[in-house]
Swiss-Prot record:
<dbReference type="GO" id="GO:0051059">
    <property type="term" value="F:NF-kappaB binding"/>
</dbReference>
<comment type="similarity">
    <text>Belongs to the AKAP95 family.</text>
</comment>
<dbReference type="GO" id="GO:0005730">
    <property type="term" value="C:nucleolus"/>
</dbReference>
<dbReference type="GO" id="GO:0034237">
    <property type="term" value="F:protein kinase A regulatory subunit binding"/>
</dbReference>
<feature type="short sequence motif" description="Bipartite nuclear localization signal">
    <location>
        <begin position="289"/>
        <end position="306"/>
    </location>
</feature>
<dbReference type="GO" id="GO:0000278">
    <property type="term" value="P:mitotic cell cycle"/>
</dbReference>
<feature type="compositionally biased region" description="Acidic residues">
    <location>
        <begin position="324"/>
        <end position="334"/>
    </location>
</feature>
<feature type="region of interest" description="Involved in chromatin-binding">
    <location>
        <begin position="387"/>
        <end position="450"/>
    </location>
</feature>
<dbReference type="GO" id="GO:0071222">
    <property type="term" value="P:cellular response to lipopolysaccharide"/>
</dbReference>
<dbReference type="GO" id="GO:0042826">
    <property type="term" value="F:histone deacetylase binding"/>
</dbReference>
<feature type="compositionally biased region" description="Basic and acidic residues">
    <location>
        <begin position="683"/>
        <end position="692"/>
    </location>
</feature>
<dbReference type="GO" id="GO:0007076">
    <property type="term" value="P:mitotic chromosome condensation"/>
</dbReference>
<dbReference type="GO" id="GO:0003690">
    <property type="term" value="F:double-stranded DNA binding"/>
</dbReference>
<feature type="region of interest" description="RII-binding">
    <location>
        <begin position="572"/>
        <end position="589"/>
    </location>
</feature>
<keyword id="KW-0597">Phosphoprotein</keyword>
<dbReference type="GO" id="GO:0008270">
    <property type="term" value="F:zinc ion binding"/>
</dbReference>
<dbReference type="GO" id="GO:0015031">
    <property type="term" value="P:protein transport"/>
</dbReference>
């Protein structure tokens, strides 16, 4: 061995100490193999006992002070040093078998006698007995310089006896405490990260029925690592869970426990030092901590256990091993039964969930129906609110405040919108739109006043009612920027910041262009309303259509801008026509003259030439019709919605009027005749309704 260590460690009871020695006084520690962790190495150890390596042997000659000094080679062994060929196998039994085979071939040089003296020496002065370190590691590229020196395995020479009795002399060493100490050290060694590759198949040279090829020969090798680490504490040193052994003095090395794993070394077994491992219970209990060291470290031992358990263990042992961390086979079977029950439960839950989904769907349908009804009610309420809300149709501006609508009509935005519309429509039409919007808002103002006189203002519901202070709500005023679709608190600095922001200016320009295009479509839609068309024709003729027009066409058409009026049901039309006919008949009977049922001053144009000829056949009827024009106008103001329907029913009404004219020449007509006329008029009105 080229770079043999001058000594594994030195204990001294005197004050003599070399550089880097640990402690002074009763005992001093000269590092591992004279390696000083805080200074230079010192190979000249002046201590009571030294452990030396020869080039290829362990020199175990007894020195004067009872230590193991360098002497004649006791046995041949493979060199153990920081050579490139280093592989520390974790198999103690395989190493022992290797050494026994080598010793039998070499004649047992340095036999068990030297070992016995070493044991006695060790028992008296807490020193290592002579042992052989068999290096079974495969050749590595080079020694890891960062590997601590205590990571090498040095095994005791157990002699030629396979059961580890040290030549039969030291069978008393089968101390349970020492065995527990070795296992304790094994656990600590495994937790320190001193783990080597166990992939060399040549390590296993003996066919042990308890040792599978690569599984159960691993765990009891690292106790010898622990010997290197704590100076012999691994074989019988004291631990917190038991008194010190009777054969050894108190250990001077610190007891590190089991890296926080208490009780892991307290196996109640009298197993010899790593030989045979004949107790299945012992093998079962330490099996889970067997593999995965290179990857898992101290916390991850034994995560994947079932790969190595398939070699040797019966089912009961496998179940007992797995019970420490994983489920046993019995547990797995129980888990299978449980999983089956869980599957049935899952099916029941699925059925229940399906029924719940069906119920939820029914509830959703009911909720949808209720919501639809609520929407209709809200729509009706909004429609009623629109009838009393000031509005500018082309600008889509609405307000309940008269001052706001007046400001809007005089605003730059409104004027620019009308100017843009004037580029697409005639100027006269745009002027009519402006006049129409102004007069419409005047009518809304009158309607609002009438409602205020009839009904008192209802208090608005407080939306914050029921919201406590624990919700941290606060009522504030805010501005809604339609261009940016953003709510800004009504604070001057925030509003000004938003008004001068780049995004707002960009968005408002885009919104203005889009708004102008939309306003053109709205203006065309308003002008398509047939009532407004008539008003526009009058306006273009120079007449004032707003003085005699008391009906708001937009409101009559449900404020729709699509040019369609709100149609009434046939029953409503029939009722209106019937009321007009009855009134005309009563007036004819009383001699007051029947009012014309036409809804406008141009009934002849709509009714056709037949009506005109029929009306012109009697001069008295013509005179009566002329007298009835003002009454018809007044009735038009009172019943605006039945205007067109009454015009369509004018044919039957004129016939009734002619009959009323002829009735005036009669003397005191009987009431029965009047009733017959009323019934006839009712039948005619019903016939006139389907012709709509």
């Amino acid at each position: 061995m080229d770079q043999g260590y001058g000594g594994y460690g030195a204990w001294s009871a005197g004050p003599a100490n070399t550089q880097g020695a640990y402690g002074t006084g009763v005992a001093s520690w000269q590092g591992y193999e004279n390696y000083n962790y805080y200074g230079a190495q010192n190979t000249s150890v002046t201590t009571g006992a030294t452990y030396s390596y020869g080039p290829a042997s362990w020199e175990a000659a007894k020195a004067n002070d009872g230590g193991l000094a360098a002497g004649a080679p006791a046995m041949h062994m493979a060199s153990y040093g920081p050579e490139p060929c280093t592989d520390n196998s974790d198999s103690l039994i395989a190493k022992i078998n290797q050494r026994l085979d080598m010793m039998s071939k070499e004649g047992g040089r340095g036999g068990s006698g030297g070992g016995g003296e070493g044991i006695q020496d060790r028992e008296s002065s807490f020193r290592f007995q002579p042992f052989e370190s068999y290096d079974s590691r495969p050749c590595l590229p080079e020694h890891n310089p960062y590997r601590p020196s205590y990571s090498y395995d040095y095994e005791f020479d157990l002699g030629s006896d396979r059961n580890g009795s040290f030549g039969g002399q030291y069978s008393e060493c089968r101390d349970p405490a020492r065995e527990r100490g070795s296992l304790d050290g094994f656990m600590r060694g495994r937790g320190q990260g001193r783990f080597q590759d166990r992939s060399n198949p040549g390590t296993f040279m003996r066919s042990d029925p308890f040792v599978p090829p690569a599984a159960s020969s691993e765990p009891l090798s690292t106790p010898w690592n622990e010997l290197n680490y704590v100076g012999g504490r691994g074989l019988g040193g004291p631990s917190p869970s038991r008194p010190p052994p009777s054969l050894f003095s108190q250990s001077m090395a610190p007891d590190y426990g089991v890296m926080g794993m208490q009780g892991a070394g307290g196996y109640d077994s009298t197993m010899p030092y790593g030989c045979g491992r004949s107790q299945p219970r012992m093998r079962d209990r330490d099996r889970p901590k067997r593999r995965g060291f290179d990857r898992f470290g101290p916390d991850g031992t034994g995560r994947k256990r079932k790969q190595f358990q398939l070699y040797e263990e019966p089912d009961t042992k496998l179940a007992r091993v797995d019970s420490e961390g994983d489920f046993s086979e019995n547990d797995d079977a129980a888990g299978d039964f449980r999983s089956g029950d869980e599957e049935f439960k899952g099916e029941d839950e699925l059925c229940d969930s399906g029924r719940q989904r069906g119920e939820k769907e029914d509830e959703d349908e009911d909720v949808k129906k209720r919501r639809e009804k609520q929407r209709r009610r809200d729509r009706t309420r909004d429609r009623a609110a629109d009838r009393i809300q000031f509005a500018c149709s082309v600008c889509k501006f609405r307000s309940f405040d008269d001052e706001e609508i007046q400001k809007h009509l005089q605003s730059k935005f409104h004027k620019e919108t009308l100017r843009f519309i004037s580029t697409k429509l005639p100027d006269k039409t745009v002027e009519f739109l402006q006049e129409y919007i102004v007069n419409r808002n005047k009518k809304i103002e009158k309607r609002r006043q009438e409602l205020m006189e009839k009904e008192t203002a209802k208090p608005k519901p407080d939306p914050f009612k029921g919201i406590g202070q624990e919700h941290f709500f606060k009522k504030i005023e805010a501005a809604h920027c339609l261009a940016c679709d953003m709510l800004i608190p009504a604070q001057p600095q925030l509003l000004q910041r938003h008004l001068h922001s780049v995004d707002h200016n960009h968005n408002r320009r885009l919104a203005a262009e889009q708004f102008k295009k939309t306003s053109l479509h709205v203006a065309k839609s308003v002008l398509n309303n047939r009532h407004i068309v008539k008003m526009l024709e009058k306006y273009l003729k120079g007449e004032d259509p707003f003085t005699s027009e008391t009906v708001d066409p937009e409101m009559e058409g449900d404020d729709n801008l699509g040019g369609e009026d709100k149609k009434e049901t046939p029953e409503e039309v029939a009722a209106d026509v019937l009321a007009e006919v009855i009134t005309a008949a009563v007036r004819a009977v009383d001699g007051e003259g029947a009012p014309a049922p036409e809804s406008s001053g141009e009934p002849a144009e709509d009714e056709g030439p037949t009506d005109t000829a029929e009306a012109g056949s009697d001069p008295q009827a013509e005179q009566l019709l002329e007298e009835q024009v003002p009454c018809g106008t007044a009735h038009e103001k009172g019943v605006p919605k039945a205007r067109s329907e009454a015009a369509e029913a004018g044919n039957g009404a004129e016939t009734m009027a002619a009959e009323a004219e002829s009735a005036q020449t009669r003397v005191a007509p009987a009431p029965a005749a009047a009733d017959a006329e009323v019934e006839q008029t009712d039948a005619e009105s019903k016939d006139a309704v389907p012709t709509e």
